[in-house]
Swiss-Prot record:
It comes from Shigella dysenteriae serotype 1 (strain Sd197). This is Cytoskeleton protein RodZ. Its main location: membrane. Keywords: Cell inner membrane, Cell membrane, Cell shape, DNA-binding, Membrane, Signal-anchor, Transmembrane, Transmembrane helix. Residues 145-218 are annotated as: Disordered. Residues 168-207 have a biased composition (Low complexity). Residues 19-71 form the HTH cro/C1-type domain.
Length: 337
């Protein structure tokens, strides 16, 4: 009868109350139990008050209660019904697994981003190429325009030079002009002969065409007495002209250009006179003289080597940019754009 009453009384007590009673019967304090079980005093107190700490997993709580029961000599089988109520097993929360479609969606998004990046890169490259081509085309058109202008100027100058009328009525055959001087004095004939024949190699056909009428007029109009007197005066300037042609004075402002490839250029001196304007072929050279400073326009700077006052002119900055060179050669040989 007493055993059944004790069993009913134990069932009425909770797990925490039974552990507390057993501890008190053994004369142990909560501090002593906590030290033996290596727990906090607050944890022992929560177990005796049938509290389940929120920050403590149910598995650990059940283990602490079993250790506490062994310490105070209470069979674990008697505490199992109370453990189910005080520390029920909680289902572990499992994070939902990401589906394969999410990875495919992210991969698709990365693919679109990469496609957009490549598209932007191609657009930038295309715009850069278009800008370079337009600049190159503009330079070529400018060179072509300058070449056409120079060709038109040269053609107009040549037409003006060809339209000058020549007075052919005064030019006579050398055979007819040489016949009348037969009656002229011997000394006059001897002085005229070297004066006319000596400069012949040094002058061009145009000069011969101009000199011949005057010579014919002098021969036909000469009389024995005045011819001997006028012949030395007329013959004296000829050696002077010949000396001026054969021994030119070197100009310190001479501009020398050697060409390694076909190149268009235009050279103007300080007076605005165009010393040259047109196309120069490969292996050609120019030696120009005028009044400094010179203004130069060069279509292909890499194809020409310039010397001014005996010193080379640096065109590297125009060669690097591959542009039409516009520069001015001052008297101090300091090219300025």
């Amino acid at each position: 009868m007493n055993t059944e009453a004790t069993h009913d009384q134990n069932e009425a007590l909770t797990t925490g109350a039974r552990l507390r009673n057993a501890r008190e019967q053994l004369g142990l304090s909560q501090q002593a139990v906590a030290e033996r079980l290596c727990l906090k005093v607050s944890t022992v107190r929560d177990i005796e008050e049938d509290k389940a700490p929120a920050d403590l997993a149910s598995t650990f709580l059940r283990g602490y209660i079993r250790s506490y029961a062994r310490l105070v000599h209470i069979p674990e089988e008697e505490l199992l019904p109370g453990l189910e109520k005080q520390a029920p097993l909680r289902a572990a929360k499992v994070a939902p697994m990401q589906s394969f479609s999410l990875g495919k969606r992210r991969k698709k998004r990365d693919g679109w981003l990469m496609t957009f990046t490549w598209l932007v890169l191609f657009v930038v490259i295309g715009l850069s190429g278009a800008w370079w081509w337009q600049d190159h085309k503009a330079q070529q058109e400018e060179i072509t325009t300058m070449a056409d202008q120079s060709s038109a100027e040269l053609s107009s100058n040549s037409e003006q030079g060809q339209s000058v009328p020549l007075n052919t009525s005064t030019t006579t055959d050398p055979a007819t002009t040489s016949t009348p001087p037969a009656s002229v004095d011997t000394t006059a004939t001897n002085t005229q002969t070297p004066a006319v024949t000596a400069p012949a190699p040094a002058v061009d056909p145009q000069q011969n065409a101009v000199v011949s009428p005057s010579q014919a007029n002098v021969d036909t109009a000469a009389t024995p007495v005045p011819t001997a007197a006028t012949t030395p005066d007329g013959a004296a300037p000829l050696p002077t002209d010949q000396a001026g042609v054969t021994t030119p004075v070197a100009d310190p402002n001479a501009l020398v250009m050697n060409f390694t490839a076909d190149c268009w250029l235009e050279v103007t001196d300080a007076t605005g006179k165009k010393l040259f304007s047109g196309m120069q072929r490969k292996d050609g050279n120019l030696n120009l003289t005028g009044q400094a400073p010179y203004k130069l326009k060069i279509g292909a700077p890499a194809a020409v080597q310039i010397q001014y006052q005996g010193k080379p002119v640096d065109l590297s900055r125009f060669i690097r940019t591959n542009q039409v060179a516009r520069l001015t050669l001052n008297a101090e040989q300091s090219p300025a754009q």
